[in-house]
Amino acid sequence: VAQALINNVKYSVAELRKDTLSNYFVANGDNPLEMTPIFFKKEVLDKYYSNPNKYTVSDGSVGCEGSWSLYIDNDHRSYVIVPLVYLGNLEYSEQLYWKGYNVSPEKDMGVSKTAYTRWKEVNICNPMFPDLYFKSCFKQFNKKWENQFGWPLFLPLVEEDEHRYKTLHCLTTENNHSDFDEQILSMTKLVIDSFNQKCIQSEIDDSNPDVESYLKQKNFSSSTELKAGIDKFQAFLLSEGMNCPDMVDFLRKVQSLRSNSVAHRKSNKRKDLAKLYEYFKLDEFSEQQVLEDIFVKMVRTLKTLEKFFMPQTSDNNE
């Protein structure tokens, strides 16, 4: 029978059903409370991220299409929390799987502020961890932009890439080369490759002095000669009076990182990669930390755009 560690005591998850657990109003023998937090290594989610056709991991939940769903607290870097009562609802095979990642909590481990607000205070709130917060901000931002301008800044992903948003996440371990590359690829497809180039192009004012200067730097006489989505986006920003070279440079660097996978980084072209290593601090921090920072900067990018173009909707929170 699958078991869970609760304060170093093993309990049978299969037997700890809702009707056998204690709650804040009724004690049921020595059995623990329904909402007792059970801790798991965050790698427990890898199985579900890797099979998006069958499973969905989202802010506060993980589930199997048409079979089961589980409330979770995934607003942490290295672990996931599940209230004990929900574990009892899993089918036996899933209980065994989760058991393999069960850990006893350390002193600094606890329920996130997000989960506390939702579970204890029964209030709605945004997640705080970079990947979850970015995905929430991205959807909200694109909707606000379309409401404001009549067209979305980011187009929907093509069918074969629809899973990219669904599975986009921070790393569950400090370093995972293949997963790091996969997340950078997903981020690039979701943001940079999805720029609504047709609508962006139509809004560029070639007579704007800043646009003229930008085109001259590229040896172009018209914005219609621009091919890359980022180039068009930068010209659009200049046309609107927004000059944010650092923000655009960040997007370009992410795109370059996408083009330089682990295999490329192991090549001899170190000079081509030196600036990327330095910019993202890939030699100083773990891939997990680097990716989290990229998510944070992507959120900052969206907030910067919202503050400039839609100040009436901006909450200025990062």
Which role fits each region the language model picked out?
Residues 1-75, 87, 92, 105-253, ...:
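Amphipathic alpha-helical interface elements
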Residues 262-274:
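Substrate-binding/catalytic groove segments of enzymes
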Residues 79:
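Cell-wall glycan-active module
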Residues 256:
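Basic, Gly/Ser/Thr-rich N-terminal segments that form RNA-phosphate-binding interfaces in CRISPR RAMP
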Residues 204-208, 275-280:
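Short linear capping/connector segments at secondary-structure termini
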Residues 259:
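Cytosolic nucleotide-binding catalytic cores of signal-transduction proteins
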Residues 95-100:
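A eukaryote-biased signal for long
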Residues 277-294:
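Short secondary-structure subsegments characteristic of cysteine-rich extracellular domains
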